[in-house]
């Protein structure tokens, strides 16, 4: 007798659940995606005990016909595809027919649904995947699915469930991503009877960003657009000053589906270039529309991994769109705003999921470029004397931070600074800026980008240049400023100019592992672009007999090792990236440092040269070169002007 048997359907569904239903958030994702596919305009999600006791999803979608309700719990039963050709033109979020039977096999499920064409609805009750009740129900609009006692029959799965707060954070993250993917749908997330999140469903993505991350974040987001023959890109990206220490705040959407893609993440960072600090990541919401034939979503049961055709072309489109958007505006960060932001970060609570995120009454007016409050919201606030402030919604990835507070009269506007690139001061021949480079060849600042006309005042701590304009006080980091100037020179000149060499009295030896020695021996000509000439010497060794004059002798060993790391660190070598990294290092090593006194003429020359840069606002490593204190900021610090003490409700009326 043969040993191979066909597993019964209940056992097969439990095995499939191991891939599809990893945690309560997985159930929420699958059920809400079904509601989206059903054409719902309003979806309510109720959870208790972080989804372990109850997950309830209610929508106003098309609903199921009576004969389809029981069939929906059969494996690979779906209305989304009909034949193999449909696999290559998938436009829905679900299509595998695995979610409902997998969820039902590890829970107690109730489905209440009705279709517009039928006179009555249908109610189904299943336990462990086995249907116990199938009966008529009073007609309702859409579908309500309740999942109770998740993993009740697979206790081993409960062992690996983290804290309720952590599981709730995962659920919140899922709803955040789906809300960003579908701003045209109103999402409501309720935990233990408390409303966590509510979006308006009016199609305004920027308002959804404000509802999830707060108005302060939405104020610093810029719209991006781009398209070619295959892709259409829309969305928002944050200004370089708004960053986080991880990629969790980047949302990439393909045809309304949230995906994870390392290469597209890298394209976003390449679009920012050196505007970002090392190890910092922006906020971004990118929605990409693509012909379904160019995207294969049938890769993983969770459908978050997608294989893309023409991925390189899409990366180029993303990088270009972000770079063009950020190049259009003035990127000088407000000094006081940054200090206040750091203070808030220090006061952040890691987990605070019990705080409800209240309904956001704001809407964003694209014509007036501002947030405003609806009349009904003002009416509700005026009824409640205690409503003196608006709590912003600050739901984040895996943590829920303390909510920010702020008046809705604060506007989301781009700061404009009257500026000029004209400096009338002459530069002395021996000034710090004349270090043997012809800066007349540096490209002028784009007309779309502006730099303030600065009057030099003094040097602070031999490190910062104090300047003023009619817009207020400016602080310029002298090292970052000259690093930017030199970087923009070297990035175009690396490999094209001969560099003077200084003979070393005692040569340097560099010993490498064998595998690295082989790679570097093949690519050591790349070091010639920086004026570094290594020769093979002995077993797994290179010798350096001379060095370029731009490289100080005390920094030779460290700098050469950094160059070698640049070459060896990337499996997919990019000459463009190598030249960028090399130019950034050369610029940094050869620039004036902190605690270096400058005379007034040298300082003015440095400011003049900074104003001619393509991107004068940050150094090659993403640190700001200049910060701004507005006149109002200074007067507030000395309390020469005061904040008004009228209620927020009064100020809202002014902005109707």
Curated annotation (Swiss-Prot):
Database matches in SUPFAM superfamilies: ATPase domain of HSP90 chaperone/DNA topoisomerase II/histidine kinase, DNA mismatch repair protein MutL, Ribosomal protein S5 domain 2-like
Keyword list, A-Z: DNA damage, DNA repair
GO CC terms of this entry: mismatch repair complex
Pfam families: DNA_mis_repair, HATPase_c_3, MutL_C
Chain residue ranges for the region called Disordered: 385-408
GO terms under biological process: mismatch repair
Signal peptide extent: none
GO MF annotation list: ATP binding; ATP hydrolysis activity; ATP-dependent DNA damage sensor activity; mismatched DNA binding
Compositional bias per record (Polar residues), positions renumbered to this chain: 387-408
Family per similarity comment: Belongs to the DNA mismatch repair MutL/HexB family.
Role noted for this protein: This protein is involved in the repair of mismatches in DNA. It is required for dam-dependent methyl-directed DNA mismatch repair. May act as a 'molecular matchmaker', a protein that promotes the formation of a stable complex between two or more DNA-binding proteins in an ATP-dependent manner without itself being part of a final effector complex.
Protein name: DNA mismatch repair protein MutL
Gene: mutL
